[in-house]
């Protein structure tokens, strides 16, 4: 065992003394050391219940002959960080979390890990760190939040972001907005739709790293507690079997995750996180081109918020990810999972599917997959749109650019009435390096939706979007403006042509004009000169490469 390097032999007497100071016995030190990686925090609703889950995980570890050691990572709530400088830290926090998991596990000689994340960047961050070690690990995602209810109508967090736009144009009163605010988030869990946190939980299960039904089992459900205990027991077996993550995470496993993502219409942020996770195994193991290639294999089969009217609780009750496997079984690759059964064995074990929620492939929500990769002279390296959440009339759009050099400028313009039907809002210098941190543009997109412009106005950015964004929102434009991408050359009034079905995005300018404009810009001057974001800005790669540190 790896932990023998920490605890075995006369030379490790000082090490054992320190462990005994923590209350561990000689008997405990004979067992596999299991790190229980928690991300409990009192500021994130998706994480406020994780103490309970970690305690239950530890019971499972003990019961099956392991010795658990709990430690914590940070966890940022994207919703609370949204719309201000705090959002610049969200994506970069993924790398801090990965480094923390790697450092703690290696320093203390853990034989295996149980990861307990919930929200957006914490899930991929923990997995990335654990992959660097290539020791057995299993993931227990914290589970979704239930939607709230007010006057017989269901609400969740995105209702509030769009509600701000509705208030601005007089659709609702401030009192009505406050009533929705009081009920939209009724308790623990990740926001109730198929936003980034829940998308990543679903893909973690699809990768084979969580037990079946873990992704969709809700935070307040006793089944989540049972899954946590079973996961604690399971990791001890995995250590004894030496079932490493690289035994599970083959190219085909990543393809399964992408197929599930495309079929469900998950968050566009998955196109950052899945390549970043794969990068820990092999450089460019998975790229944006894989999303593009696989998008032709599956249709969009589930109408879940923000791309429909269903919630995560509906997906769970319809059969969860095993049911999605079953519906897609002609496309799903047969790969290993931490459960011990293969993906197709899990698919065949499904006893019930609600086909009103998880549609059959021959009767999908949309014929095209839920995510789309676009390329053209505006984004030579690609950009991403959640086409499953776009009004079909906006699948093709041509309009004049309204250009803003930050999210703050754009939201002021939108709420100030500067945007009219037909416009293409361009928000730049918000990429991984330029932002820095690649902020989510949820406030601008929600304002556009709330003001009723989402069927006539497109938004393009080198930043990214919340999983809760809907409408013609095209993000991750690569190369970004700070790297001299074409988006930096766009001026007010330039005509932008978008064809989501044809997978194209172009600005109607001659190449010579683009080159001339870019030549006059000079070298990008970083916005932040010190601290973590300054280092991040210098070291981060492009969005099409997963925005990983070089």
Curated annotation (Swiss-Prot):
Catalytic activity: (2R)-2,3-dihydroxy-3-methylbutanoate = 3-methyl-2-oxobutanoate + H2O; (2R,3R)-2,3-dihydroxy-3-methylpentanoate = (S)-3-methyl-2-oxopentanoate + H2O
Domain of life: Archaea
Gene Ontology MF, one: magnesium ion binding
Keywords, in A-Z order: 2Fe-2S, Amino-acid biosynthesis, Branched-chain amino acid biosynthesis, Iron, Iron-sulfur, Lyase, Magnesium, Metal-binding
Protein EC: 4.2.1.9
Binding positions for Mg(2+) per the UniProt entry: 78, 120-121, 440
Cofactors demanded by this protein: [2Fe-2S] cluster; Mg(2+)
Note on how the cofactor is bound: Binds 1 [2Fe-2S] cluster per subunit. This cluster acts as a Lewis acid cofactor.
Gene3D superfamilies the UniProt entry points to: IlvD/EDD C-terminal domain-like
Pfam families, sorted: ILV_EDD_C (PF24877), ILVD_EDD_N (PF00920)
Residues with PTM N6-carboxylysine: 121
UniProt GO cellular component terms: cytosol
Subunit structure: Homodimer.
Family of this protein: Belongs to the IlvD/Edd family.
HAMAP family, per database record: IlvD (MF_00012)
Protein name: Dihydroxy-acid dehydratase
């Amino acid at each position: 065992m790896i932990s023998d390097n920490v605890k075995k032999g006369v030379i490790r007497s000082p090490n054992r003394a320190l462990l005994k100071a923590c209350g561990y016995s000689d008997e405990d030190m004979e067992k596999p050391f299991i790190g229980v990686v928690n991300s409990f925090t009192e500021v994130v609703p998706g994480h406020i219940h994780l103490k309970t889950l970690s305690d239950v995980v530890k019971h499972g570890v003990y019961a099956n002959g392991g010795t658990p050691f709990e430690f914590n990572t940070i966890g940022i709530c994207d919703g609370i960080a949204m719309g201000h400088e705090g959002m610049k830290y969200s994506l970069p926090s993924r790398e801090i979390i990965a480094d923390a998991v790697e450092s703690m596990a290696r320093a203390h000689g853990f034989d295996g890990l149980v990861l307990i994340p919930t929200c957006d960047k914490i899930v991929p961050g923990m997995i990335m760190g654990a992959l660097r070690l290539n020791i057995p690990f299993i993931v227990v995602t914290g589970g979704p939040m239930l939607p709230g209810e007010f006057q017989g109508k269901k609400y969740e967090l995105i209702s509030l972001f769009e509600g701000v736009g509705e208030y601005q144009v007089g659709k609702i009163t401030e009192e009505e907005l406050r009533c929705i605010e009081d009920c939209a988030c009724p308790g623990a869990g990740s926001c109730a739709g198929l936003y980034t946190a829940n998308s990543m939980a679903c893909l973690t299960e699809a990768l084979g790293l969580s037990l079946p039904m873990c992704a969709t089992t809700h935070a307040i459900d006793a089944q989540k507690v049972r899954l946590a205990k079973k996961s604690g027991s399971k990791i001890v077996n995995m250590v004894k079997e030496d079932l490493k993550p690289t035994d599970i995470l083959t190219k085909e496993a990543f393809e399964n995750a992408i197929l599930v993502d495309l079929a469900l219409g998950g968050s566009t942020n998955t196109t950052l996180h899945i390549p970043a996770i794969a990068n820990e195994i092999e450089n460019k193991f998975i790229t944006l081109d894989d999303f593009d290639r696989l998008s032709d294999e599956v249709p969009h089969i589930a109408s879940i918020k923000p791309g429909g009217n269903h919630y995560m609780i509906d997906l769970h009750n319809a059969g969860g990810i095993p049911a999605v496997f079953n519906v897609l079984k002609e496309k799903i690759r047969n790969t290993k999972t931490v459960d011990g059964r293969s993906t197709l064995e899990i698919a065949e074990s499904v006893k019930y599917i609600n086909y009103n929620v998880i549609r059959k492939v021959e009767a999908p929500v949309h014929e095209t997959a839920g995510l789309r990769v676009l390329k053209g002279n505006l984004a030579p390296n690609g950009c991403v749109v959640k086409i499953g959440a776009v009004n079909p009339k906006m699948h093709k759009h041509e309009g004049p650019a309204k250009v803003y050099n930050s999210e703050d400028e754009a939201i002021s313009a939108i709420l100030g009435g500067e945007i009219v039907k037909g416009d293409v809002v361009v928000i730049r210098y918000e990429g991984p390096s330029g932002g820095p941190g690649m902020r989510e543009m949820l406030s601008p997109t929600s304002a556009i939706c709330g003001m009723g412009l989402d069927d006539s106005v497109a938004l393009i950015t080198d930043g990214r979007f919340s999983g809760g964004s809907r409408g013609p929102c095209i993000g991750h434009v690569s190369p970004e403006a700070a790297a001299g991408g074409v988006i930096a050359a766009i001026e007010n009034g330039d005509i932008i042509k978008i064809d989501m079905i044809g997978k194209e995005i172009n600005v109607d300018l001659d190449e010579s004009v683009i080159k001339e404009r870019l030549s006059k810009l000079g070298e990008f001057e970083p916005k932040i000169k010190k601290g973590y974001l300054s280092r991040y800005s210098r070291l981060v790669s492009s969005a099409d490469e997963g925005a990983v540190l070089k």
